[in-house]
Every structure is written in structure tokens, then in C-alpha cells.
Amino acid sequence: MAGAAPTTAFGQAVIGPPGSGKTTYCLGMSEFLRALGRRVAVVNLDPANEGLPYECAVDVGELVGLGDVMDALRLGPNGGLLYCMEYLEANLDWLRAKLEPLRGHYFLFDCPGQVELCTHHTSLRSIFSQMAQWDLRLTAVHLVDSHYCTDPAKFISVLCTSLATMLHVELPHVNLLSKMDLIEHYGKLAFNLDYYTEVLDLSYLLDHLASDPFFSHYRQLNEKLVQLIEDYSLVSFIPLNIQDKDSIQRVLQAVDKANGYCFGVQEQRSLEALMSAAVGADFHFSSTLGIQEKYLASSDQTAEQEAMQL
């Protein structure tokens, strides 16, 4: 029937550690999508989120409150949040009843920031799996603060966390380096930006760590971690400045390709636009180079000097 609501829905599960910019991303992405003409519903799955800057279509706080759980069960913030997710998992009928009237919208799920929820705890994964049974196609959008690139040890840690998340969540996955406009506020990058976004030869990071007296004692451990990351060869990043429309568009292009939205029937596209969405997301070098020129200070001389020191 022409007036029937579409059976398949699409959306993004926005995940990442605390402070990575998930809520700000949901606000910026929702505004961008509405400007494109998409009907958007933002769903807050974080019971600790207060003072939300966006219009919330569904709020898990209506089902269970973190403060109430902490008081009643004498749990801390982390334990209370895990309980809230387990409670939501046990009451998915409530969530489905809230989402069903929004069928035909594009969903943005603002998820909690506790890392363990995406690396080894099962509740969030089970919730996403159940959504797939409701014919809701999600892409996991994993945000990581870009300033971690300025510290080789932290960047290796980020790579391990990103890999563990990709393997555990079991969704089409897009990793983002958020807050690109602030990337060098904590220090200069040792290499060009594409080294970090494409996760190139990580042995160079090991050489940088070896120059640090503290990390030199853990070289074998770091070598094994790097080997694990390179053996899987799954992790890469897209740089994002949520204030930059071109940057948001590149992210959306990758997300649409990952969950199949660009090939759906909800949004009419010309053949040229379809091919652009299908192929263009695979080639990030030119866009990454543009972002580097925009947000990073010229460092050719510094790079040469550091290369001489290796």
C-alpha cells in the first residue's frame, strides 16, 4: 500500500567512552539529518544523562532512573548503570512500545559511556540484537577523543578498546576521531593524520614508546598488542568535527553504507548520488588531507626531525 509505513527502520547506536562527545554528536547529527529532510528520533539509552540538549523522542529515564537504583540497591555509579541496562534488557517490551509509533523515523541511540558495556558486558549487545529482530538496522558509531593520537601509549589503548568493541557489539561499525578542532591542544602529532585514521604500520609507535624510560620496560607487551591489532586489521577511523557540515556528511556517508540505508527505498536518490555513497566512502585520503590542513599546524620539519631520532 502506498500509505503504509516502511517496515525496515535504520539508525545509529552512538557509543564511546565518557567525554568523547556522544550527546553532542547526537545533537549535531540530528540537526544535519533534519536539514536533509529525514525524520529523526533521538533515543536516550543513558539513564545518567541529564539536561539533554536535543529533543528526546524516547528516554530510558522514564523506565528506570540511575539515582533511584543507586539509592535503593546501594550501588555506585558504574554498578547502578549496569543494573539499569540489565533492567532495560529485561523490559524490552517497554522499549518496543515506545519505538513502534516512530516507525519511519531515522533513529539515533545515545548510549551510556561505560566502556565495559561495549567490551564484555552482554546487556547492550542483547538489546541491539533484539532491535535487529524488530527489523531495525543499526550501525555502531564509536567515538574516541582525537587528542589520544598525541600520546602513542594512549593511542594503542584506544585501538585495543575499539577492536574489542567491534568484536563484542556485533554491528556494522564506524569508528570516529571526535573533536578534531581540538586535536593538537594536548600536543603535536608525531605523524600525519592519515597514519592514525588508517592505522598504518604501528611499529613506528613502538619506536616512539621505546624512547620513554617507563614504556621501554613494557616493549614486549606493546609488541604483542600491536601484533593483535594488525592481525585483525579491522580498525580505522574517520575524523570528525561536529561543527563542520562537510565532516558530518563524510561520516553519514560511511554510516549509510554500513547499514544499507543508501540502498533503501525511503529516500529517492539519483544514480549518481547512489554511486557516490556506494564507492566514495572507501577513499578517505583526500578528505583526511583536507582536515589535516585545516586543523593541524604544519609539522614537516618536526616530522623529519623525529624521523631522524628513530
From Swiss-Prot:
GTP binds at G19, S20, G21, K22, T23, T24, S178, K179, M180, D181. The modification N-acetylalanine is found at A2. The keyword Mitochondrion does not apply. Keywords: Acetylation, GTP-binding, Hydrolase, Nucleotide-binding. Coiled coil: none annotated. GO terms for molecular function: GTP binding; GTPase activity. A motif (Gly-Pro-Asn (GPN)-loop) lies at residues 76-78. The record marks N78 as: Stabilizes the phosphate intermediate. InterPro entries: Gpn, Gpn2, P-loop_NTPase. It comes from the Eukaryota. PANTHER family: GPN-LOOP GTPASE 2, XPA-BINDING PROTEIN 1-RELATED. Heterodimers with GPN1 or GPN3. Binds to RNA polymerase II (RNAPII). Small GTPase required for proper localization of RNA polymerase II and III (RNAPII and RNAPIII). May act at an RNAP assembly step prior to nuclear import. Belongs to the GPN-loop GTPase family. This is GPN-loop GTPase 2. It comes from Rattus norvegicus. The gene is Gpn2.
